[in-house]
Amino acid sequence: GYCVCNVLNYHPEVKAVIECSGFNSSSDMFESGGKSQAGNVIYAMTPFIKIHERFKYGKYASNTAMDGFENTNASILVLHSADDNVIGIEYGYDMYYEKYKDDPRFTFIRFEDRGHNEVFNNPDNTYKDEFNAEFDKWLESLDYNYKAEENKERFKEDKAKYTTENLDRAKWSTRLDEELFVKFLDFYNTAIK
């Protein structure tokens, strides 16, 4: 998400971008994740994160997605789920929507219950849940403590074998939300005309 928008600072000639589950500035990623790990302490740490990024990345550290939006005439599609627990929706989508909701260059797709890593998947395809439920039963059937350090290698091999023997690759590979991807294609096709 962040990268495809930030690149507009350097390549304003890009015709269209689709930003998924992203954030406005690089430090937002640390802040969003840090809130769940450190609570409000993250706000005291954020200035140090920004200084570190400035030393490490120089001028690039201060770039934002919104700077990129202002630097281009590209069409922008922003997609995020309200329940994203990796990057909070307030770090990107909400800010962008507030500023650009009336700008015809922008298209917004907001989901309520797709999280971060499942945003592209069809919510009606339950195969992942089915596979995980069976996997959990398999875990319970093991005759050893798979979390113990001495069983780490054994578990790695057993897990790989279980997955190879039980994963239905056809069902797994058809989890994408095809209607969403048709929207993506339509968006790009319209933008490049």
Where on the chain are the PLM-derived regions?
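Short glycine-rich catalytic loops that host catalytic nucleophiles or stabilize transition states
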Residues: I109-R114
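Catalytic active-site module of serine/aspartate enzymes centered on a nucleophile-bearing elbow/loop
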Residues: P123-K193
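Active-site nucleophile elbow and catalytic-triad environment of alpha/beta-hydrolase enzymes
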Residues: H52-G68, A74
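Acidic catalytic loop of the alpha/beta-hydrolase fold
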Residues: A82-I87, H116-E118
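Catalytic nucleophile loop
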Residues: G1-Y2
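Short alpha-helix in the alpha/beta-hydrolase fold that links the catalytic acid
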Residues: A74, G88-K99, P123-D124
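Hydrolase active-site cap/lid region
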Residues: N6-G58
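Short beta-strand/loop motif that positions the catalytic acidic residue
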Residues: T72-N73, V78-D84
